[in-house]
Structures are given as C-alpha cells and as structure tokens.
Amino acid sequence: MSKVIGIDLGTTNSCVAVREGDETKVIENSEGARTTPSMVAFTDNGERLVGQAAKRQAVTNPANTLYAVKRLIGRRYDDPTVQKDKEMVPYAIVRGDNGDAWVEARGEKYAPSQIAAYVLGKMKETAESYLGETVSQAVITVPAYFNDAQRQATRDAGKIAGLEVLRIINEPTAAALAYGLGKRDSGTVAVYDLGGGTFDVSILEISDGVIEVKSTNGDTFLGGEDFDNRIIGFLADEFKKDQGIDLRGDKLALQRLKEAAEKAKIELSSSKETEINLPFITADASGPKHLVVKLSRAKLESLVDDLIQRTLGPCRAAIKDASVSANEIDEVILVGGMTRMPKVIETVKEFFGKDPARNVNPDEVVAIGAAVQGAVLKGDVKDVLLLDVTPLSLGIETLGGVFTRLIDRNTTIPTKKSQTFSTAEDNQNAVTIKVYQGEREMAADNKLLGNFDLQGIAPAPRGVPQIEVTFDIDANGIVNVSAKDKATNKEQQIKIQASGGLSDADIDRMVKDAEANASADKAKRELVELRNSTESLIHQTEKSITEGGDKVPAADKSEAEAAIAEAREALGGENLDTLKAASEKLTQAAMKVGQGVYQAGQGAEGGAAPEGEKKDENVVDADFEDLEDDSKKH
C-alpha cells in the first residue's frame, strides 16, 4: 500500500514528510536540504526550474522567477493586497481570464495554483526518490485563516501536480498534531505561526489523543516577505539618499536587494549587526555604483515593529473566542521561520507570559503533522482524533444587503446547518443565493464565494414561500450549499466554486500540461544522463586503445575509432534515439577492444612460460652467486 505524504506548501519554503512505522521522517531533497524554496523559474531556453535551481538564477532572471505566489492563491486581481504586492515583486502580476490574480513569465500567463502545483510536483518527486515508489496521495497544509476560495485553489494545485489530496489541514493544527502525538498530558496550547507570507494563531485543547481546535485567527497577508520588503525599502532609501538613484525601478537590482534583505534578516537573529555589501548594484554616467550599508538588529526591529504588533490583534481575538485568558495557556508553540527572530520570541513571551516551547523545529513541524494526519487517515496511526474549526463565518446575502450568518466562525467541522428564508416580492419565481464568508455585517464587505439560482418557485405573495438553505462544510473546510423550495421540493445544489477560481476544464488542461512537461522533463533528464555516460564511455575506450597499444587488433581499433566519432557526432545533437544507438554501438566496440587486449595478454603469457621459468631461475641464481662472490671477496 502506497504511503501518504504530508506537504507543508509554504510561501517561502516547502517541506515534505512521511510516516514510517512509529517515526515521522522529513525527506531531504536532491540538494540534500530538508526544505525547498517555493520558487519556479522559466529560462530563456524554455526550461522550467523549481526550488533551489530556480533560486540560484533569480538574480540574473528576476522577471521570470516566481516566488511568494501563495499570497496570490484564491485572490481576485482587484484585491487591494494584490495591488500592493504588484509594486514589490520583479515579476508581472496580471488579471487572469476569470478575474483572479495570475502571474506572467516569458509571455505566458499562469494561475497561482499552477505555480503551486510545480512546487508540489517537486515535493512529490522528492518523496518518490526517497521511498522508491510512486506517490499519489497527500495531505497538504494551508494557513488556518485561508478562506474557501484559497482552500479550493490549493486542492486544485494538488490535482494539477497529480496528487489525490486526502485532506487539507490547517498549519497550526498540523503543528499541534506533531507536538501532541504521543503526549498524554492534557492542556491548552497556543500555536503562533508566522511564516513567509501568512500569520495564524490557534488555541487548542490536547487531551489523551484528542486534539480539539477551540479557535483560530490570523492574517493571510502578513509574514517574512513583509519583513524583507521593509529592509528592501530601507536599503533603497539609503542608496537614493547617498547616490540619488532609486533602485526600485530596476528589476535586477531589486532582486539583489531581496536576496540581501533575506540574508541580513537571518544573520540578525544571531548577531547584533551586519553589513550589506552589493558591488556594482547599478551605474550612471559617472560609472558603477556600489551599495554598502550597515544594519543593526535594533534598526531592523524598529523597521518591523508594527508588523510584529499586528500579530497580537489576532492573538487577542483567538483567546477571546476560545474563552480563555493568556495566562491559562499551558504551552506556546512557535511555527514558521520568522519565529526565530529574537524580537518575535520576546513579544510572544510578553503576551502569553511564558517562554515558548523550544523542542519543535519551526520549519518542519507542519509537514510532520501533515504526514501524521495522512497516517491517521490510512489507519496507520490510531487513538488520535483531530477536531478542527472553520476560520470564518459563512452566510448569505438577505434583504437590504445584510450578511445573515448560518455558520459562525470557530464552529467544529465537518458541520451542517439549515435555515429557512422567503421571497422579497410577490409572485417571485426565482431567487439568487449569494454565499459569503467573513465577519462584516454587510454582505458586500465580505468575501463572495459564489452564487446560484433556485428557479421554479410557485407563485405566492412575498414572505409565503419557504426556501430552506443548507450549508455543509467538510473536513477540509470546503463548502457545499443547497437551496430547496419546500412547497415544490425543487432543489438546487452547488459545490461552491469561487467567483473566479479554476473551472474543471482549466484544471484538466493544467493537469495535461503538467503531465506533458513531466514527460519532457523526464526525456531531458534521460538525455543528460545518457550524454554523461556516453562521454565517460568515449574516454574509457580511448584510454583502452592507448594503453592496449599493439595488443589491440587493427580491425577492433578501427571499429572503435569509428564508433567514437559517431558518438561524438550524436553528442552534438539533441536526438535521444540517435545518441542511444551510437552509445550502444560504442559499448559493443569497447568490449571488443577489451577482449582483444585481454586475449593478446593471455597468449603472450602462455607462450613465454618456459622462457619465463628459465629467466626466474637465472635471477635467483644470479642473486645467490652475487652473494657468494661477495663473501669470497671479503
């Protein structure tokens, strides 16, 4: 039975883990790292790079290197946060055909789900390489505060990557699952998750294998990327002050600033000051310009203080919704790379009144929890019950544009709720059901998830028809809605597809594209491997001919040299079959050379044996006689 992998699909980095027996293993990628950059690049020769390979070339290819795309997933192009993000990244964020925020590289438009799918594909490949078998099922994590559109888009990404997504699980819940597995102590735990692009906080009760989420809150546009952007802004301002040149309009310079900002941020978690030195950052008529700026930890903290303070609002809301106080929290778990920043740790400690737990790896704990959940779903881990919640209230628009809630936030899922509504006008024969998610009182201020029509209502005065609307949220937090006219029993049911979102046709097209690319990638890798082995074979054959000298039969030597020439010619092309045939031909010729040398050696040795024995006797005699001669001389 194939394994279920757990994937933490992060904004900045991603991680994959698998449950093996009683242990959960974080799997290293092909570069030997336990996390993989969530980056995808498209090169000028049409190659697609994912992970570390994409990150390595980002500085020289900024417009076609896509990162932090998770922040766009499930969002509309007109969303103010998307417009803000457009100003901060060197690649193009464009309007998709469906009105969603998409990205563009090399003239092609891509849905964020598609880019996420390439990252998920890399994680799938990493797991398959380690396990030695095909992987088809996964549990994928999302920020707890993701809405339905963002969850659907993440599930779509899994499908495009060729994965059956068994469960979408909230990141803080996954962390608590990894932390709480095997613990028999009961207690209230807060998970503070500040990652690359999103912030979540969840309050959970852990007791005897039951992990129950009491509340969750967060901000899906707050994370390490924002901290980096503050440093980038500071560096650009300092350079403009010093040189009078604004680097913000230079994509190449912006990408170098981005890398330097990330590096400086990490260094300042362990040192008090760092120097950012970027030679030849730009040039003007007077010549090249260099950026050299010192950044202290204190300065960094002042630049990002408001961002850190922004995390406390959701913390207050979460403990209020969970009906606990900060000092009733027994343990605080830190998740996400940003929680390594000393100021963040200090702020969390002050808020909750206790030191956070130090026994979890903030970069890996979410993937570990996802792998555990995969094992739970497969029945490999028993005595664990996970009770999660819906992060946002769900409801419909009613008369006057009011948002009428059917399911309140922090309701345990899966759940189902029905409510009866009526018509607003006499003889109304159809109603439009508009489904929203959010906490504002007016529907228009919340996130429109989708809408549908219930037709064929029997003519009646306003207020008489009985229309039952039912909301059903599954364990992934994905919403289904139905509406039924009680008089006629006519029912209309939809699985909510975001007002934008990907259609089934879009997903199928992207799946086919991913499969085609996978075949092309496989062929490309096969060609590279064959090139390497053929070049090695040419070298070995030439070495055998040289070392064999006269022992190589002339016919074999001539055949091998012709095969070498043919192989060299095939190496200059791109045809896999031609190279394969040339390589096989050279292999046969090389074997003949080897056999010829071996047989010639055997023949020479067999023919010269008596003479050899005679020679040996002479050598021994000569030695003996020399010694005797010496003794006679003395």
Curated annotation (Swiss-Prot):
Gene symbol of the encoding locus: dnaK
Region spans: Disordered: 601-634
Pfam family, one: HSP70
Key word ATP-binding present: yes
Comp. bias (Low complexity): 601-610
Coiled-coil intervals: none
Ranges of compositional bias, category Acidic residues: 619-634
GO molecular function annotation: ATP binding; ATP-dependent protein folding chaperone; unfolded protein binding
SUPFAM superfamilies: Actin-like ATPase domain, Heat shock protein 70kD (HSP70), peptide-binding domain
Transmembrane segments: none
Protein name: Chaperone protein DnaK
Family: Belongs to the heat shock protein 70 family.
